[in-house]
Amino acid sequence: SGLITNIPLIKKIAQKNKPIILSTGMAFESEIVKAMKTIKKYNSRELAVLVCTSIYPCKDYMINLSKISTYKKKFKAIIGYSDHTQDNFASISSVLMGAKVIEKHITFKKMNFGDHKISADFKEMSKLIKGIRRAESIIGKSKIEPNNEELKFRKLYLKKIISKKKIIKGE
């Protein structure tokens, strides 16, 4: 994030023609666009642009995951999220919003200084990955049709009237 305005450095990196992850903390839209144009001019590989708030730790009201849908509309790139919160909720929520790449700091030992306080330890990282996989499962497919489990119940419940008590003919 802190180097998004360093166009000579971005150009040098782009010329390596490797996939690039561009974090956008503290950046204005015009700066993101300029960095992306530089990358795309010199690099034909994949580009991921991450929504990021460069505050450590980042409070919920600062996160603004709505940017994910804005980025998806405005930028031709893979969109992701760079998480600087102290739990996994924002990362998992970002997947539900459409993020395809997640950046989360990891540490061997939790400490109350530097990046350590916002970093996940190995147990938390494992929970994050499981949470992301669950979120992906919840998202499902965009087809408008019943899933296989619903189809099993379709014959039982579709166009039927069910009564709690016996109905006598003529009632």
Model-derived regions: residue spans:
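Catalytic cores and adjacent flexible loops of soluble metabolic enzymes
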Residues: S1-E171
